[in-house]
Amino acid sequence: MNKMTEPKFAVGDRVIYNPKRTGNGWLAGEHGTVIYVDNTEAAYTVEFDVPVAEGNTDYRARANEIEPKPWHGWFCKEENLEAEA
């Protein structure tokens, strides 16, 4: 497995959506849990603790470019962000 497709997170990891990302600003700062890891694309499906949109009962959102370091991608691990504080 090369560096591009090496999983950064595992199922069950707690993550926070990057509040600085503007593409999906409505998710800024939201917490969630990784529920699926696609090892082929290093993509993840995150189930958020709150609905991703008003009236939306599907709390899942898929994102690529996830990095474990705070805000070097769409998400970071909760524990990594807490360690930076």
List PLM regions with ranges.
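Mixed-charge, Lys/Arg-rich low-complexity intrinsically disordered regions
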Residues: 1-23
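Generic beta-strand structural signal
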Residues: 10, 37-39, 83
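Short beta-strand-centered aromatic/proline hotspots
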Residues: 27-37
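Short aromatic-glycine-enriched beta-strand elements
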Residues: 41-45
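Intrinsically disordered, low-complexity, charged/polar segments
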Residues: 49-85
